[in-house]
Amino acid sequence: MINLNSRTIGILSTSLGAMLIGVAPILVRMSEISPSLTGFYRFLVATFILFIYGIAKNKFINLKFKDILVLAIPGIFFGSDITLWHWSINQTSVANAALFVNTAPIYVAIISYFLFKDKLDMFFYFAGLCCLGGVFLILFEQNEYQTFTGDLLSLVAAVFYSGYLISVKKFSETYETFHLMFFSALFGCIPLYLGSLLEIGQ
């Protein structure tokens, strides 16, 4: 029997998650409903499944209203990220949308440096400059306005995604993983629903 430590499990889980994220934009492009509504139903189904699990495991006991407000923050960030990202997928190439939204770690490092005084080494500066340099080369190579807009949307989505990652990291010191997942899915529905209303109005 193979014994896996927590670090190995974390790396494997992250790798699997990255592969699934890689498939997500393709499925969004194939969806027959609007981009935001596609994301809304994704979050709604996740909320429903997590709610059933939470009830079965008594996960909602001792939660205060203040806790729910705090836990809403990652959800708003995540829902805003997905709303903008889904819009970008329909306005630029799937490859560009996936590439630009994954510049989030650059923003995470920069924001963490200013907010939490996390140290950045020279390798980060070099890698970050290479990454952003590549992004700008791709951006300004575009000839079509719609494609350029889609690329910008995915870059803004990355900023919201970094907000989600930072808030989850910070709040994981106080709250259970389940609570972070459930309320991220629940409150993530809000910006996605608002986004779908905007799409109806167009």
Task: Kindly label every feature range from the protein language model.
Residues L37, F43-T47, H86-K117, A157:
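Specific alpha-helical transmembrane segments that line the substrate/conduction pathway
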Residues T38, T177-M181:
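Juxtamembrane helix-start motifs in multi-pass secondary transporters
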Residues F65, A98-V101, K117-L137, E144-L153:
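Loop-to-transmembrane alpha-helix entry segments
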Residues L50, G54, A72, L120-F140, ...:
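Hydrophobic transmembrane alpha-helices of multi-pass small-molecule transport proteins
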